[in-house]
Amino acid sequence: MLKKLLGIIFVSTLLTNIVVALEADIFVQTTVDRASKLLSDNISKEKKIEELKLIAKDTVDIEGIGFYTLGSNRKNLNDDQKKEYAKKFEEYFLKSFSSRLAEYTNPEIDVFGKEVLNENYTIVNSTLKATNERPEIKIDWRIYTKNPDQPLIRDLIIEGLSLARTQKEEFASVLSSNNGEIEALFKTLEEFSNK
């Protein structure tokens, strides 16, 4: 009886993980298709940027990425500083994300695989198809799946390089060269956002 019960629990867990993984790759493909359609539309770059920001707000865990990139420095912030950082990081992230992506016209991304890491994370594998201007690029998406009804992008790993980790290192460098003063990072974020 105990073996049968354990078998049922194991199969249930396995099926739950398969459903989460399926949702994660469908989520990525849907997000990619949405962005690709927008980028191929005959609208101004400014309009594309605004629409890309909306897509990012719907699909990316901006706050989670923001506090990850702050690293252990977040422990030193009071509540007001955390709120200010979250606001400034969101502005920074949205501008960086949308202005870079707006340069692409009709990017073709194929989602081809996935790996459930645990109940909270799934890695979705894809490639950005090659064109005459660029080679094929491997992109892995780290999807936060704790809430399967609303998966969120937590990181992109492009050709093995984590964008979130790279951002974390850049922010650590700014803080390190300014004696850990969060105001220096705030200023850096503001300057980028106001360009």
Q: Predicted regions: what is each one?
A:
Residues E23-L101:
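Early exported N-terminus immediately downstream of N-terminal targeting peptides
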Residues K95-I137, T188, F192-K195:
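Surface-exposed, charged secondary-structure patches
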Residues D155-K195:
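Low-complexity, intrinsically disordered terminal/linker segments enriched in charged
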